[in-house]
Amino acid sequence: MRTPLIDLRGIRKSYGGGDSPLVNVLRGIDLSIHTGEFVAIVGASGSGKSTLMNILGCLDRPTSGEYLFAGENVAALGSDELAWLRREAFGFVFQGYHLIPSGSAQENVEMPAIYAGTPAAERHARAAALLDRLGLASRTGNRPHQLSGGQQQRVSIARALMNGGHIILADEPTGALDSHSGAEVMTLLDELASQGHVVILITHDREVAARAKRVIEISDGLVISDTAQDASDVQRSVNPAALQAVDLRKRLSEGSGSQSAWQGELFDAIRAAWRVMWINRFRTALTLLGIVIGVASVVVMLAVGEGSKRQVMAQMSSFGSNIIYLNGKAPNPRAPKGVITLEEVAALGELPEVKMIMPVNGGQAGVRYGNLDHSSYVGGNDTHFPAIFNWPVVEGSYFSEADEQNAAAVAVIGYKVRQKLFGEQSDPVGQYILIENVPFQVVGVLQEKGATSGDLDSDNRIAIPYSSASIRLFGTQDPEYITIATRDANNVKQAEQSIRNLLQQLHHGKQDYELTNNAAMIQAEARTQNTLSLMLGSIAAISLLVGGIGVMNIMLMTVRERTREIGIRMATGARQSDILRQFLTEAVMLSVVGGLAGIVLALGMGAALLLSKVAVAFTLPAVAGAFACALITGVIFGFMPARKAARLDPVAALTSE
């Protein structure tokens, strides 16, 4: 005696319990089905036949009892193994067709093969052949709404056969069709049965059930009759095609854990995601807006911060990283400020680490030319000024040693002073300006440097001989501060220590001076700018977070709208991981498109800022980081909706509206 392909023993199914009343739908079903049988399960509405079909097709689990498939206890199978059975052993034909609305006939038929990992070329050819066999060769590209009811049901049958369809479970396949289309579908089922497929027909129509070779009647959750038209039909020799079904147990143990389908599934998921986004264009655009604004904000904020940092660093570095500044300071709050004398300046200049040294005697002063007044920093320097600061004269010349010795009333003005007092047209060289009402002749104009940081503008200064500043303007020979250029920019710390040691001797250990160097100032400014950039980026990231919440919201709505599609995919063999991947891919796709659009918008905004003379510097890490954040946002905020979709009950999903 042959082992039954399907063997049900005492199957019971109950719903409710606890706070709700217990409903017993199946009350002890005993049933065996062999390979090659055409069986009709008939019963009135509410008899439990659809529940029985769901259990037979591994869409649902019984409350109690034993279900053996090819000798394997189905209760011991995990969700992935059940999905494998639905994909490889069963093919479902539903009364409502259950086709995915956004997919073509060909794509609907190919779906089980995608989850089976069938190569694209092979599944395309097989789907086309099945549709051709069922008379739909000219309808392969049509969407379900472009097909008649009979054509949609034939697409459903083709889908059931895509992976072999050893067992066809047809739930009221003619219920929604006219008599002609219904007859065509029943003829197809007859042909499949004659070719060796197990056909299990669920119906309430006894005329339809009469087409089967074996009729099982169910009422109130119990089998009340089981008759075969001809005993020889049940025990007939099995078509060779049906022999494949008895090997399913071995194939189940070998193939249920296979992960070979992920590439095809991923491509299908991307294509499906793009189609859904396009169908709901307006809603997608509103969702994307949050991601676009978030990414663009992060990229632009970081670009502005980086541009400002580079501009400030370039301007500070232009003064030289080998510069040390020496100032007098008060050793304590009650003591007077220390003084660095010119004799000490000369002593410091003798140190081997010192290349050049220059005292500066200066301060803020009022400047007038004609009827124009301006406030500028006026510094008394010596002739080392251009060399120490790498600051050439672009008009005229710098004052000479003779001017320094003679305390000549000559001045070299900065670029901003030139702009304020003389504009672009006038030549300032040779003209006289009043500094604190003392006339000075302009002999040169310094090259433009720009602002170093904050409101400090290096170009808003005037250089005059040190002797002139001391005698004509400030009335003191003592310098305001000392500028020291070291010989080696890499050994500034060593030079600073040598200067400190000498000053300790000269000042008898008194700490009434202060040393700072340009390199340290540059590093400190860099840290400040980095902190500012981080703060700007963090503020902008809030909008990206809001965009992520929008993605989660739209994905939750999508899962709700496409619950039936999820059920269809599960019925055709999708595992929970496949559904998770499907909806996670859609969330990531939203983030990818939003991220790319955000980067494009950011580049456009950056170009506009550059035209407005705002320093902007886009960096690959910043752009890539913002895009990566968008992706991570998609994964994080898309995971919960995708997980919810993957955990849906197949039966509940299929019956949802």
Curated annotation (Swiss-Prot):
CDD domains in the record: ABC_MJ0796_LolCDE_FtsE
GO cellular component: a single term: plasma membrane
Any Pfam family hit: MacB_PCD
Keyword DNA repair: no
Class of this enzyme: translocase
Keywords associated with the record: ATP-binding, Cell inner membrane, Cell membrane, Membrane, Nucleotide-binding, Translocase, Transmembrane, Transmembrane helix, Transport
Known EC number: 7.6.2.-
Location in or out of the cell: Cell inner membrane
Residues at which ATP binds: 43-50
Keyword Repressor: no
ABC transporter domain segment(s): 6-245
Transmembrane segments annotated in the record for this chain: 285-305, 539-559, 590-610, 620-640
Gene Ontology MF annotations: ATP binding; ATP hydrolysis activity; transmembrane transporter activity
Gene3D superfamilies referenced in this protein's UniProt entry, alphabetically: P-loop containing nucleotide triphosphate hydrolases
Stated family: Belongs to the ABC transporter superfamily. Macrolide exporter (TC 3.A.1.122) family.
Main function: Part of the tripartite efflux system PvdRT-OpmQ required for the secretion into the extracellular milieu of the siderophore pyoverdine (PVD), which is involved in iron acquisition. This subunit binds PVD and drives its secretion by hydrolyzing ATP. The system is responsible for export of newly synthesized PVD after the final steps of biosynthesis have taken place in the periplasm.
Quaternary organization: Part of the tripartite efflux system PvdRT-OpmQ, which is composed of an inner membrane component with both ATPase and permease domains, PvdT, a periplasmic membrane fusion protein, PvdR, and an outer membrane component, OpmQ.
Entry protein name: Pyoverdine export ATP-binding/permease protein PvdT
